A protein has these predicted regions:
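A generic structural signal for tightly packed, nonpolar segments enriched in small/aliphatic residues
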Residues: 1-160
Length: 160
């Protein structure tokens, strides 16, 4: 792996965790939630998380759960071009970041996707924006939000 920026270390640790749980456990899906990229804040602001997934059914279930508990998420793409950027290294099998300036949240998700077994439903929630609010919104005070706790519970309660 070509490590392109040592300040983007979170995705390396998360990739290890994704690999580890697949080797150690019988899984029917993987959901990771983390404050991964500032790029998602640029695209969605601080009130909606970025959702990336290799599975439409899982993505829809997560968006529905988020709507129900007022923890919004928006599905973002992992395009073929994002994956090509991750796989385009002159010195390694893959890069930890994309090759360009744009689409940082998408290329970060494309990087994580490389560690998920092809047939395993997976979703990644980038909560870099939603993890902290700059002002009080409804019942959520300024500061740390706990975003994702209610969404995760709702999703698990309704998981088939």
């Amino acid at each position: 792996m070509e490590v392109c920026n040592t300040d983007a270390e979170g995705r390396l640790i998360l990739a290890d965790a994704i690999s580890y749980v697949q080797k150690q456990y019988q899984l029917d899906s993987i959901l990771d939630i983390c404050t991964l990229t500032g790029a998602i804040c640029v695209g969605l602001g601080e009130y909606t998380a970025g959702l990336f997934s290799n599975n439409d059914e899982m993505a829809t279930a997560l968006m529905d759960a988020g709507k129900k508990v007022q923890e919004r998420c928006w599905r973002m793409p992992i395009e073929e071009e994002h994956e090509e950027e991750i796989l385009n290294s002159n010195v390694a099998d893959l890069r930890s970041m994309g090759t360009g300036r744009y689409g940082g949240a998408c290329t970060a998700a494309a990087f994580l996707k490389q560690f998920v077994k092809n047939d395993l439903p997976w979703a990644h929630l980038d909560i870099a924006g939603t993890g902290m609010y700059s002002k009080t919104v409804d019942w959520v005070p300024r500061g740390g939000t706990g975003y994702g706790v209610q969404l995760l519970i709702e999703w698990l309660l309704n998981k088939k």
